[in-house]
Curated annotation (Swiss-Prot):
A motif ('HIGH' region) lies at residues 32-42. It catalyses: tRNA(Cys) + L-cysteine + ATP = L-cysteinyl-tRNA(Cys) + AMP + diphosphate. This is Cysteine--tRNA ligase. GO terms for biological process: cysteinyl-tRNA aminoacylation. Monomer. It comes from the Bacteria. It comes from Paracoccus denitrificans (strain Pd 1222). Zn(2+) binds at C30, C221, H246, E250. The gene is cysS. Binds 1 zinc ion per subunit.
Amino acid sequence: MVEIRLTNTRTRRKEVFRPIDPQNVRLYLCGPTVYDRAHLGNARPVVVIDVLVRLLRHLLGADHVTYVRNFTDVDDKINATALARKEAGTPGTLEELIRERTHETIGWYHADMDALGAERPDHEPRATDYIGEMIAMIETLIAGGHAYARDGHVLFRVRSYADYGKLSGRSVDDMIAGARVEVAPFKEDPMDFVLWKPSDDELPGWDSPWGRGRPGWHIECSAMSYELLGESFDIHAGGIDLQFPHHENEIAQSCCAHPHGDFARVWLHNEMLQVEGRKMSKSLGNFFTVRDLLDQGIPGEVIRFVLLSTHYRKPMDWTAEKAREAEAVLRRWRGLVAGVEPAPGPAPAVVAALADDLNTAGAIAALHEMAGQGDGPGLLAGARMLGLLTEDLGGWIAEGPDLSALTERMAALRADAKASKDFSAVDALKQRLLDAGVEVRMSAAGVELLPGPDFDAAKLPE
């Protein structure tokens, strides 16, 4: 059995992954708050964890993995979006507009993630379906002295949990000293966070022992993961921006409500995304959603390839040049595997790279080597471990040009040139290929020809 090693944010070490129950590996990914389209940064953890799930199912069996990704469908941002629509004259009550918006946004999210080749999780719980479980968990926290009710709010008593701050490497006193926020009068301590808050008549709300209200964000994930995965499960994942306060708060409330469990054993966090070397933001004019890219004609498979080309723990820079290069590579690879059956399993080099802390860049390097060797079956099997070259994602491309004869011709000329030290024939063929829009890659692994965005079959040498 191949050993998987993952970098655990909680311990700050790369560790051998040892499932609690090898017959049922359980993992949870924080999903979207459904008020608007998913931007590219939202897609990165989805694609990364999709590869992890594929790896786990390959090694342990398809039926031995339970993957949960939630929808946060009760949130102030959702309320604000619906209120803006109501004020703009959209007919319907605020409650109806909120329901319409969340339903619409979940549909958008599914369509966009499907376009990136991300397989649907086993469970996609919606927060509003677990309100009763959240209330029960809050009652448990109050009974244990970890939470208190005041002015219609319920707050978690942060200092009641001695390990608070260990995930993010912060101390409570340092956090208070560095805070620049006005402390709400109903808080005992500035660091205490909301588990439940009151709702007025127009906003979504549910009856509770503390009056009509709605849950805080953090309790939602704790309640849903407990109900679907238990008090101890294997992996919790999300973007590094969620490490604090969201994940820190999840740990605190879950471990206090269920003191005999570990909550999540392994914490995986992907780094942030940049665009052309700068932070993605609306103020810089470089903010875009997954749908924006798809509507620009960038195929979902190309977006996926670019997302996987950088290790998940490194900041990822999206550039137009990377997208063009990815498209050229995928065109070449699809040409190589046209009409080919995949090998019985992915090459050991691909599996080994993914087992080493999800080194997707290393796995792609192994695929490049197979492509250079003309190993279509191996390339296809390995690429599918990454969710690439699948039938579902192939609709964007016509059947790729068959460059195998030219590849063999270049390889033969190159071999002769190495013996004779005369590379004139190699250079001449290379130039004609470049003129036809073909990228020529030559390495110790062999020759690889990739149709580029300016590819013109009419200019290919005969």
